[in-house]
Amino acid sequence: MLITKKDVEYTARKRIEKLYDFAIRTGDRRYIIEMEHIAQRMDITLPANIKRGYCKKCKTPYRNQVVRIKKNLVTVKCPVCDDIRRFQISR
């Protein structure tokens, strides 16, 4: 049985989702770092909900963050490194 590229990508995506779940549950950075490493190695774009679920600067998953909403902009502040990220939303 041959392993196709789709099979490998499917397995990588499932592993990324599982690592993200572990990161959210435990609050551990190493799962986020491993998840990014897999996505980069397999040339996979992370889904938007995963991309927005952790701090890009310190790689800590958002758990108890400060969220502000103004018009069509959501501002999230990381509780660890105080980095601020802004996301556009449509209403």
UniProtKB/Swiss-Prot annotation:
Organism placement in taxonomy: Archaea, Methanobacteriati, Thermoplasmatota, Thermoplasmata, Thermoplasmatales
Catalytic activity: Endonucleolytic cleavage of RNA, removing 5'-extranucleotides from tRNA precursor
Function field: Part of ribonuclease P, a protein complex that generates mature tRNA molecules by cleaving their 5'-ends.
Chief localisation class: cytoplasm
Binding positions for Zn(2+) per the UniProt entry: 55, 58, 78, 81
EC number: 3.1.26.5
The entry's keywords: Cytoplasm, Endonuclease, Hydrolase, Metal-binding, Nuclease, tRNA processing, Zinc
Entry's Gene Ontology cellular component terms: cytoplasm; ribonuclease P complex
Cofactor, free-text remark: Binds 1 zinc ion per subunit.
Family of this protein: Belongs to the eukaryotic/archaeal RNase P protein component 4 family.
Any one of the GO BP annotations: tRNA 5'-leader removal
Protein name: Ribonuclease P protein component 4
Assembly and oligomerization: Consists of a catalytic RNA component and at least 4-5 protein subunits.
Superkingdom of the source species: Archaea
Cofactor: Zn(2+)
Record-level Gene Ontology MF annotations: ribonuclease P activity; zinc ion binding
InterPro entries assigned: RNP4 (IPR016432)
Organism: Thermoplasma acidophilum (strain ATCC 25905 / DSM 1728 / JCM 9062 / NBRC 15155 / AMRC-C165)
Compartments where located: Cytoplasm
